[in-house]
Amino acid sequence: GTPTMGGIIILISVLIPTILLCDLTNIYIIIMLITTFWMGLIGFADDYIKVFKNNKKGLAGRFKILGQTLLGIIVCVLMYNHDDIVIRENLQKNQKFENEIIYNLNDNTQYFGDSQKSLKTTIPFFKNNQLDYETLTGDGQKPLITFLLFAFIVVFIITAVSNSANLTDGIDGLATGCSAIIGATLGIFCYVSGNMVFANYLDIMFIPNLSELVVFMSSFVGACVGFLWYNSYPAQVFMGDVGSLSISLFELGINL
């Protein structure tokens, strides 16, 4: 008799502060809003069929996979082609670029190159903590193959991880509690990666304008903590697929 579809509360609690407080022209915010609406609709359709149509199977698995795959393609195309998704790399003193940034802090001069499109991904244990997809396909000599490889990995990650919160949603408070911790950690990484001083000091890729996502993740953490009050044992409401699918994609979208 415990009500479900409580994830709608989480979505509203995230969307309203984001729309009111964030720069809606920021491409990272746009991607997260698209992800939120898209997975929210898939989760809502699944819960609606289960609750109101008395069909325990919910939305057919093939439609879920199709929706997640389409979302992965949209996110991949935006990330690959949008001019605002760039990085700035730290330079040595003997390296010079036309539009370099020189940042001086306590006589410690740091040089950053011009904004550049890149398929580099931060991964620990790799050289310089980065994996460059272009090096996997011949140093950028085969851009189509590089894009297809990047697209495959993005789509695979989205379809594989999007249901991860479902695995923890069966125990009271577990999904929201874990998600709040993950969200807070990712919010810190967004701020650090969007700040050239901290990014350079901690050897993290500097991504301009990424720190705008701190507002989004703060809303997400607040929504999870607030929902946890009613979802902890004994649970008064469950988030349902509309919540669990969206939560998974919140975390996954930030990681991508």
Language model feature labels by segment:
Residues G1-T2, K56-Q68:
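Juxtamembrane helix-capping/reentrant segments at transmembrane boundaries
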Residues G1-T2, N128-I145, I204-V214:
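Short aromatic-rich membrane-water interface segments that cap or initiate transmembrane helices
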Residues I9-L41, L70-T121, F126-K127, L149-L256:
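Alpha-helical transmembrane segments
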Residues M39-K50:
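Alpha-helical transmembrane segments within multi-pass membrane transporters and channels
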Residues V51, L59, I123:
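Short clusters of hydrophobic/aromatic residues that line enzyme substrate/ligand-binding pockets
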Residues N54-K57, M205-F206:
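Short helix/strand-bridging catalytic loops that position acidic/His residues to coordinate divalent metals
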